[in-house]
Amino acid sequence: MVRLNSAAGSRWWAPAMAILAVALSVEAAEVARYDNYRLYRVTPHSEAQLRSVAAMEQASDSLIFLETARKLGDRFDIVVAPHKLADFTETLESDYIPHELIEQNVQRAFDEERVRLTNKRAKGPFDWNDYHTLEEIHAWLDQLASEHPKEVELLDAGRSHQNRTMKGVKLSYGPGRPGVFLEGGIHAREWISPATVTYILNQLLTSEDAKVRALAEKFDWYVFPNANPDGYAYTFQVNRLWRKTRKAYGPFCYGADPNRNWDFHWAEQGTSNNACSDTYHGSEAFSEVETRSLAAFVEKLRGKLGAYIAFHSYSQLLLFPYGHTGEHSPNHQDLNEIAEATVKSLAKRYGTQYKYGNVYDAIYPASGSSVDWSYGAQDVKIAYTYELRPDGDAWNGFVLPPNEIVPTGEETLDSLITLLEESSARGYYDEKH
């Protein structure tokens, strides 16, 4: 676990408060812009360097970490506000931390995306040629239930902090089937996640491919494309890089990380107690109504769910429990072997290479996640997290071009078939119904 250097943290705290005050105007629906924000790739090579960078992450809202500080030798990308550039580079240079300027104006990518989406609004039906708003996704789910009343049932897991519906669907071809839960969009800025989940759902419902049909009809599917509806809407309306929920924590800070808020080894590893941090774990386990509501829904399925699959981006990883400890789970060998077969299957169509492993060792310590909770608290022994395209070398991973939505969906569905076939062959769904 990274421990913060208090001296380094204090260097960043006062300036952070200044920029947070400016953020109050953003809450009034003024679109957040990142003009002349720069993107740096930083690679700590010593424990002292890692502590220094971690202190910046915890203390300053002037910096946006696109990935959480991890292990020595890992690269991670940091968006730097113009007024903070001198302090940021001075810290890196004084601590001899290797760094590289990747992009001089982050806003450029967001402007291109916004123009494209604005043009799309005047066009045709729901498809996977571009990304969709929360309202469009919810309307499409309503349409599925209307057009396929025998197979598709609308689900309502509750209301978000801002009173949006936690909407999902159940896809079923008959009683007595084991359940598979698909969770999308728990991190707001990861747009490829809901896009992939809706693509998979559509294929399960409409594909004539024999393997897809067999998969669709073997399980009951509980599908929630947007587990963080407030945050997702906020990325379209105000701040494209928003990650958390939208609950207010004091006058300056909003939201908790909904994938650090679940009641399984909550707040132990890889989280922050700073409410302004992107990895803030919340005031208590299930402090966020979104995680609390989704957990209550899943608890009602206890004994029926055979698998819980969460979709995130980015880095091209397939991960499984645990995140709070390096100790292996009881069925670690099975999970590892299934993951190995799954990533091989994923690579066949487009050559996309994934890595795999337990969360703690493969990427970084992270406690309080939905997948760890489903595994550890709900006894769902097939529990995986996909970190979708692109790989970790891409700085603009949250702005994945729309022409990669369908390929991402195709290869992910290929791999999901293998994942569920491999786990089924090991008997994991024999008593789930």
Curated annotation (Swiss-Prot):
A GO-annotated cellular component: extracellular space
Family, per entry: Belongs to the peptidase M14 family.
Main location group: secreted
Location(s) in or outside the cell: Secreted
Top-level lineage group: Eukaryota
Disulfide bridge positions per record: C253-C276
GO molecular function: metallocarboxypeptidase activity; zinc ion binding
Lineage: Eukaryota, Metazoa, Ecdysozoa, Arthropoda, Hexapoda
Triggers of expression: By blood meal, 10 fold increase within 10 hours.
Keywords (A to Z) from UniProt: Carboxypeptidase, Disulfide bond, Hydrolase, Metal-binding, Metalloprotease, Protease, Secreted, Signal, Zinc
Identification of the protein by name: Zinc carboxypeptidase A 1
Entries under PANTHER family matching the protein: PROTEASE FAMILY M14 CARBOXYPEPTIDASE A,B, RH39904P-RELATED
CDD domains assigned to the protein according to its UniProt record, in alphabetical order: M14_CP_A-B_like
Record-listed E.C. numbers: 3.4.17.-
Active site: E387 (proton donor/acceptor)
Known function: Involved in the digestion of the blood meal.
UniProt enzyme class: hydrolase
Pfam families reported in the protein's UniProt record: Peptidase_M14 (PF00246), Propep_M14 (PF02244)
Annotated tissue distribution: Expressed in the posterior midgut in pupae and female adults.
Cofactors (names): Zn(2+)
Biological-process GO terms, alphabetical: digestion; proteolysis
